[in-house]
């Protein structure tokens, strides 16, 4: 291994609160070699992001202090240099890529100018030179028309292109180290793979070092040279990725590896297929469904208005007790379809029949039955719950509206619902702010069960959760569908989860169903090129299964061909 460009020794960060001191980082030590990608993994709250912010002295609160330890950047201790020197280090020597580019790009400043600003500050170029350099960087990070796109604003780009712009801003100062803090968490699987390949190509061409923060072991297995595992502010273990993944020493690392959803493998059990004696009458039947929206055209929707086919000719059947997964990228129509099923989005044409009632022909009666018999679990567990109500009050409210449980029996039913979702009964007295994301999602599932539904629609309900919590929620769904004969429509962009949970998989692309079938068959022998592309883009925890495996999803020249980087001395 080459010499360390960054060496952290016994770094300790404490929070000084009115109630006393609290250790947030506990004597963390690690090394980053030149040209190396180090994966920093762990659940939310493990200290990953705080560690990286501590490296550049950007602690999120004045109550937090670096108490001891050292951060050596090529021999210089960053904990001891002046604030003026630290300003030059940030961006100039250590660049940062954040999780949500929308929050970190200036919404009223052109993309090109945001890159040029850093170039002028750190490299001392004039406006014309900085503009030329910024255009070159836009091309390097994959913008197809960098000259014209220089003038565009962040809101004019997709999430993936905004993340490319964020990488461009970080590269503008030619740093020695890039810190990428969950740079792909909010992105679709294919866009995620493109960003990861871009980071690897940048490393190869520029010779810089990267710290990649993530909670997904599949990502680090595919992209990183070494892995460091954190929990509770401590570094539990680190080492070469193959050694750590094949011979983990710490029980927590073992749990992380076991919790990672597996992709097609003969040794991994898949979801059970529907039973032969399943009723012939479908619970939900969708026939040639179309949902169209008019966009643009100004206040009066004039000649400039365009029609978007959000859902186009979708036909689908769900049998009682069946678990069906719908997968696809953002904009594929998954969530629009879910909202249409629940009557939250008007239908342009087609039919939705729920338990024998056609919602188009008997809308009032159909919606009344649907609201009684169907429920939804949302993506963001915090925003989906009323912050003013305790969990018990929230469940009581639903039970009263539902009207099936006598008032005297409601407290007992609340306790039963909490038991069903694996929460202790004392959670009835707690509000969402005092609960973790996984606990809030369990409460959201309890609320859905409170209506005693036949159908549950789960819309990206585990996307915001850590991998171990994801595994717990998936197992909860599996148990509930088995115990209660629930029909589950599970919407996700994570194919590995769908493959492990769902009996059937439906693949949507641009509003249409492009493939449908038993999960085992879809994943083992995909028929549509788009399905094959989605599967190829999933980072597998086995480092020998290469990302994309020869599949080019970009439809553009490879990143390696468009990155004329100069290697740093």
Please provide the spans of the model-predicted regions.
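Conserved ABC transporter NBD signature motif
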Residues: 65-77, 350-358
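Short catalytic/signature loops enriched in Gly
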Residues: 3-4, 21, 144-151, 241-290, ...
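Conserved ABC ATPase "signature" region
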Residues: 77, 129-148, 358, 409-426, ...
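ABC ATPase NBD coupling module
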Residues: 78-95, 121, 242-248, 300-305, ...
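Conserved ABC ATPase signature
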Residues: 152-157, 161, 431-435, 439
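Conserved catalytic motifs of ABC-family nucleotide-binding domains
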Residues: 174, 452
């Amino acid at each position: 291994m080459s010499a360390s460009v960054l060496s952290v020794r016994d770094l300790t960060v404490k929070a000084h609160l009115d109630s006393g001191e609290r250790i947030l980082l506990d004597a963390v030590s690690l090394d980053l070699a030149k040209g190396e990608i180090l994966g920093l993994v762990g659940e939310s709250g493990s200290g990953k992001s705080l560690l990286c912010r501590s490296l550049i002295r950007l602690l999120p609160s004045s109550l937090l202090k670096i108490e001891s330890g050292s951060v050596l950047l090529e021999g210089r201790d960053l904990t001891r240099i002046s604030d003026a020197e630290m300003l030059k280090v940030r961006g100039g020597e250590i660049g940062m890529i954040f999780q949500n580019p929308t929050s970190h790009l200036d919404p009223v400043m052109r993309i090109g100018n945001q890159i040029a600003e850093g170039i002028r500050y750190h490299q001392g170029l004039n406006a014309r030179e900085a503009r030329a350099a910024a255009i070159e960087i836009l091309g390097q990070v994959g913008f197809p028309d960098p000259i014209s796109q220089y003038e565009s604003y962040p809101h004019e780009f997709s999430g993936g292109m905004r993340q490319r712009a964020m990488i461009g801003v970080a590269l503008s100062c030619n740093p020695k180290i890039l810190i990428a803090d969950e740079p792909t968490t909010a992105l679709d699987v294919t866009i995620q793979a493109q960003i990861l390949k871009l980071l690897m190509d940048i490393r190869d061409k520029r010779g810089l070092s990267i710290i990649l923060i993530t909670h997904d072991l599949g990502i680090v297995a595919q992209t990183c040279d070494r892995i460091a595992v954190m929990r509770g502010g401590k570094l539990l273990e680190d080492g070469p990725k193959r050694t750590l993944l094949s011979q983990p020493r710490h029980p927590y690392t073992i749990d992380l590896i076991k919790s990672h959803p597996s992709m097609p493998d003969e040794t991994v059990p898949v979801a059970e297929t529907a039973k032969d004696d399943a009723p012939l009458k479908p619970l939900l039947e969708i026939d040639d469904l179309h949902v169209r929206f008019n966009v643009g055209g100004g206040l009066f929707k004039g000649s400039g208005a365009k029609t978007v086919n959000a859902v186009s000719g979708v036909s689908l059947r769900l049998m009682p007790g069946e678990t069906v997964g719908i997968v696809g990228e953002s904009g594929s129509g998954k969530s629009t379809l879910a909202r249409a099923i629940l009557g939250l989005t008007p239908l342009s044409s087609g039919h939705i029949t729920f338990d024998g009632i056609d919602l188009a022909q008997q809308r009032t009666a159909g919606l009344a039955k649907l609201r009684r018999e169907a429920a939804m679990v949302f993506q963001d567990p915090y925003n989906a719950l009323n912050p003013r109500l305790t969990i018990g009050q929230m469940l009581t409210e639903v039970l009263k509206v539902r009207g099936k449980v006598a008032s005297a029996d409601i407290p007992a039913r609340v306790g039963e619902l909490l038991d069903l979702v694996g929460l202790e009964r004392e959670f009835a007295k707690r509000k969402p702010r005092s609960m973790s994301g996984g606990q809030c999602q369990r409460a959201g599932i309890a609320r859905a069960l409170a209506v005693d539904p036949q159908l549950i629609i789960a819309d990206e309900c585990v996307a915001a959760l850590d991998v171990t919590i994801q595994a717990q929620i998936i197992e909860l769904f599996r148990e509930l569908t088995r115990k209660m004969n629930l029909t589950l429509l599970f919407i996700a962009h994570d194919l590995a989860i769908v493959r492990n949970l769902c009996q059937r998989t439906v693949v949507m692309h641009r509003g249409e169903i492009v493939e449908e079938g038993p999960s085992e068959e879809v994943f083992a022998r995909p028929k549509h090129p788009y399905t094959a592309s989605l599967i190829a883009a999933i980072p597998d925890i086995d480092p020998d299964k290469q990302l994309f495996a020869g599949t080019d999803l970009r439809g553009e020249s490879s990143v390696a061909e468009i990155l004329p980087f100069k290697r740093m001395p």
